[in-house]
Amino acid sequence: MKNNIDYILYDLSPNVGGLNEVVLMSSDYFIVPVAPDFFCWQAIRSLSKNIPRWHKELALFKENNDGNSSQSIKNAPQFLGMIQQRYRPRKGAPVKSFEKWMAAIRDAVDSILVPNLEKITCIIPRDKVQHAINKTTVSGDLSAYDLAHISDFNSLIAISQQLATPVFSISDQQIRDSGQFGHALNTMKSSRDAFNEQFKGLAQRVLELTK
């Protein structure tokens, strides 16, 4: 508030060390990014055990110390949902091999992570998440707690990294300057525009859920 900053984003590494514990449990909200593979499916189970463990540890610490201090860890981050990403699309949908893992991860979130987070009140209610999704999407392919589906960036990521520019902000000229022309140029422009809409929708959902 002092510096007119509304949101601070932390990009945490995929581990369950002490630093991640403190950062996550002192946050107001959190989102879990996942890729469609066995390791992310397994990680959902790990989060389902470790977040409640962290919550218990910090609750005990606050009880035995000055837990009412304005600088103490809140210990109640609210789960907004997950972002399914880094999959290969075909005709606008994930190919079957990726869809299998996306469905398995979605099931693990619904059946394992969500119930465990509900026990410690570290989650936004499902109906509120679904309302935010319905309000900010017209495709109908998302449901709580799926906040967004972001496919692989393919060649756009190389241009993005070279220019230090977000994928959705790459200009037509910058794509041409990378050596693209004809059908490839048009395909990359269409992909860039699609990513722009996806990220706009995700931002709107986050704003809706955290306002």
Predicted regions and their residues:
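C-terminal lobe/tail of nucleotide-utilizing enzymes
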Residues: 64-211
